[in-house]
């Protein structure tokens, strides 16, 4: 009788484990809605998506920057973002260790990520960068 109880307990434990692991896996997939670019151009369209998939690899998820194999400046409360043309220039052309992303982003994508940086992470620069501003800066 005890053996039957142990077998029943084991079956219940296996079923519960499978159910919990499936639920956890579904939750992980629901929270990880990032897009991944394939090819030479980024497919992300919002500033948040672009920052999350392009910029945060170096500047960190909280935009605090890092020092290690290189020096990645903090974007938190960064006064260099005040003049909108400067971050547009950096994203398009790069500088020092930062590559330029101008060939990989449309004018709208550059504007989106610059506007996101200028209005998040302790930055409150409300003048909006447009795709036309980026196009004009590329000339």
Model features per residue range: what roles?
Residues 43, 83, 87, 109-110:
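Stable alpha-helical elements in mature extracytoplasmic
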Residues 60, 64-104:
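Gly/Gly-Pro-rich "capping" loops immediately C-terminal to redox-active cysteine motifs
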Residues 24-50, 66:
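Electrostatic cytochrome c docking/interface patches
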Residues 28-38, 107-139:
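Flexible coil segments in periplasmic/lumen-exposed cytochrome c-class electron-transfer proteins
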Residues 11-21:
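Bacterial N-terminal signal peptides
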Residues 47, 51-61, 113:
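The canonical Cys-X-X-Cys-His
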